[in-house]
């Protein structure tokens, strides 16, 4: 019934406020259903567990915030833009609940097309076509080996895998998980992400950083039981590349002049430590991975919103040009809050996420202590660098007379509240473990 309502809304719900009401009702329904029954299977190939619940709620929440954020520009009244937005939300909604692995793969790839169309059609620069092309090539060709092997080894559309299929695959194992590593994105496969973020409209950056990057972790989590032995064998290689990349990208963030690129590269850094923790298969890291996915999704979405609030008034993304925001205390307060959340300050989910990921990695090998501490330290450095450059100093630009609206205040507040509430309800995530 819920899926039929979602499909009908794709064609008949054009007013964004009606969409928001529909999404809020769906969120409440999922919360009530998920808290009452933590795992169930229905309609043969749909499956609903705590991780699915968390990802679906995050998807719906970010979609609501996307609609609120798009109200200030012409996209708000664009029916095609609203259609792509709601289509992508429904594709994600189905993807996070599918139990059939072939169907999961199809929806996993189908989610790409709405975001590529949003980047190519509503991006602000001519380079948006190149950004969409990069994203398409990396993600589609990265996941083709998985589809080919699935079809070669099993002719049934049910895709019930046999144990012998995934024993001692060696190099083929990397080809199978390449599609997930590109989506995360893992260091060395991350070049598409900064381009996509820089050229995407505000709503596109929000859903890309908030939800789409988590699809890679979700797919890895769903498929890990099929190549568990290979993951154990090659996990150290993935951990070393991920942690080394997280440290290098964190250093690179300190040299960024474009604020949107800085936020995009910080996402790559945080996803690096999350991937490293994911492949250790420990209770600490499983708990930290889920919290980091949700906390980072809300934090990065909020940072892109803040960036756009400044861009609408100063028409520049250069950190060297954006200065003196402390003269606008309300705006400066939001920058301070999201900067400390980005560096995993207390009272947020990111703190526990990085804490459990770090503990799990150190338990896996003490040699990882140094890169973990370096990554956490550098994360604090570039977050402080971003806040201090934006808020202090003499501004080179004339700030627009356009005041911060109540809609924008609510938008920022709705990013903060879930992180604090979930921080106070940590035992909700422990049910997954």
From Swiss-Prot:
Annotated Pfam families: Oxidored_q5_N, Proton_antipo_M
Topology of this chain in the membrane: Multi-pass membrane protein
Catalyses which reaction(s): a ubiquinone + NADH + 5 H(+)(in) = a ubiquinol + NAD(+) + 4 H(+)(out)
Keywords attached to this entry: Electron transport, Membrane, Mitochondrion, NAD, Respiratory chain, Translocase, Transmembrane, Transmembrane helix, Transport, Ubiquinone
Locations listed in the record: Mitochondrion membrane
Top EC category: translocase
Main location: mitochondrion
GO BP annotations, alphabetical order: ATP synthesis coupled electron transport; electron transport coupled proton transport
Domain of life: Eukaryota
GO molecular function list: NADH dehydrogenase (ubiquinone) activity; ubiquinone binding
InterPro entries: NADH4_N, NADH_UbQ_OxRdtase, ND/Mrp_TM
The keyword Signal appears for this protein: no
Disulfide bonds: none
Transmembrane segments: 10-30, 45-65, 80-100, 101-121, 132-152, 169-189, 203-223, 234-254, 261-281, 286-306, 331-353, 366-386, 410-430
GO CC, alphabetical: mitochondrial membrane
Protein EC: 7.1.1.2
Stated family: Belongs to the complex I subunit 4 family.
Function description: Core subunit of the mitochondrial membrane respiratory chain NADH dehydrogenase (Complex I) that is believed to belong to the minimal assembly required for catalysis. Complex I functions in the transfer of electrons from NADH to the respiratory chain. The immediate electron acceptor for the enzyme is believed to be ubiquinone.
PANTHER family noted in UniProt: NADH-UBIQUINONE OXIDOREDUCTASE CHAIN 4 (PTHR43507:SF20)
Entry protein name: NADH-ubiquinone oxidoreductase chain 4
The species this protein was found in: Rhipicephalus sanguineus (Brown dog tick)
Taxonomic path: Eukaryota, Metazoa, Ecdysozoa, Arthropoda, Chelicerata
Name of the gene: ND4
């Amino acid at each position: 019934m819920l899926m039929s309502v979602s499909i009908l809304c794709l064609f008949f719900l054009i007013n964004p406020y009606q969409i928001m009401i529909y999404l809020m009702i769906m969120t409440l329904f999922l919360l009530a259903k998920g808290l009452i029954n933590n795992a169930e299977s229905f309609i043969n190939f749909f499956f609903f567990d705590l991780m699915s619940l968390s990802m679906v709620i995050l998807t719906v929440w970010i979609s609501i915030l996307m609609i609120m954020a798009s109200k200030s520009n012409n996209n708000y009244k664009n029916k095609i833009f609203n259609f792509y937005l709601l289509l992508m939300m429904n594709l994600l909604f189905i993807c996070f609940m599918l139990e059939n692995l072939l169907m999961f793969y199809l929806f996993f790839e189908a989610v790409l097309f709405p975001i590529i169309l949003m980047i190519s059609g509503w991006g602000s620069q001519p380079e948006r076509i190149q950004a969409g092309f990069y994203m398409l090539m990396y993600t589609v060709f990265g996941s083709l080996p998985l589809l080919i092997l699935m079809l070669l080894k099993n002719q049934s559309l049910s895709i019930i895998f046999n144990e012998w299929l995934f024993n001692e695959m060696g190099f083929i194992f990397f080809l199978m998980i390449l599609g997930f590593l590109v989506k995360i994105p893992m260091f060395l496969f991350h070049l598409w992400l900064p381009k996509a973020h820089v050229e995407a409209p505000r709503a596109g950056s929000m859903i890309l950083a908030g939800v789409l990057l988590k699809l890679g972790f979700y797919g890895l989590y769903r498929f890990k039981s099929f190549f568990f032995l290979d993951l154990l064998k090659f996990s150290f290689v993935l951990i070393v590349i991920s942690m080394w990349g997280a440290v290098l990208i964190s250093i690179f963030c300190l040299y960024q002049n474009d604020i949107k690129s800085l936020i995009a590269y910080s996402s790559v850094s945080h996803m690096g430590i999350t991937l490293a923790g994911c492949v250790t298969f420990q209770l600490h890291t499983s708990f930290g991975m889920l919290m980091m996915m949700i906390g980072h999704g809300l934090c990065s979405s909020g940072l892109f919103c803040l960036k756009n609030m400044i861009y609408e008034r100063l028409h520049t993304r250069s950190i060297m040009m954006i200065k003196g925001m402390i003269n606008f205390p309300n705006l400066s307060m939001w920058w301070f809050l999201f900067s400390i959340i980005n560096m995993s300050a207390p009272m947020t989910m990111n703190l526990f996420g990085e804490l459990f990921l770090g503990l799990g990695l150190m338990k896996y090998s003490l040699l990882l202590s140094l890169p973990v501490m370096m990554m956490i330290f550098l994360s604090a450095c570039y977050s402080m660098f971003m806040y201090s450059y934006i808020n202090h100093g003499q501004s080179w630009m004339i700030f627009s007379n356009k005041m911060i609206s109540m809609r924008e205040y609510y938008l920022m507040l709705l990013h903060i509240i879930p992180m604090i509430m979930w921080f106070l309800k940590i035992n909700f995530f422990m049910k997954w473990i």
